[in-house]
Swiss-Prot record:
Keywords of this entry: Mitochondrion
UniProt xrefs under InterPro entries: DUF4508
Highest taxon of source: Eukaryota
UniProt key word Mitochondrion: yes
One Pfam family here: DUF4508
GO cellular component: cytosol; mitochondrion
Name under which the protein is recorded: Uncharacterized protein C14orf119
Localization per Swiss-Prot or TrEMBL: Mitochondrion
Primary site of residence: mitochondrion
Keyword GTP-binding: no
Amino acid sequence: MPLESSSSMPLSFPSLLPSVPHNTNPSPPLMSYITSQEMKCILHWFANWSGPQRERFLEDLVAKAVPEKLQPLLDSLEQLSVSGADRPPSIFECQLHLWDQWFRGWAEQERNEFVRQLEFSEPDFVAKFYQAVAATAGKD
């Protein structure tokens, strides 16, 4: 109910917010605070990983992007080793374990958003990722 002045005329206040048409904002999809923090964490780790660690992450990312392809799975199995089972995991191995857990909990649009954020900070790495995914085409 509008406020009324003493002369019984309704008072109207201009909107303080600009009128924005719906669905014209190219911003990324909304995601939970927790998911956004997980992504920030992984991107921070990535910035500090060595070349071989980044290559290992690339293999895992490709395997996640093309899960039905057998070749990435076989390539990942080659990375497994039973030697050193008595030692505790390295920090990098713990980071990969968390990455795997978090990634599995993300929706497809959140996964795509992660790749978009990674591409913003590491375009060369993401270009290698796209090349590796394309290379899996036809390999069953």
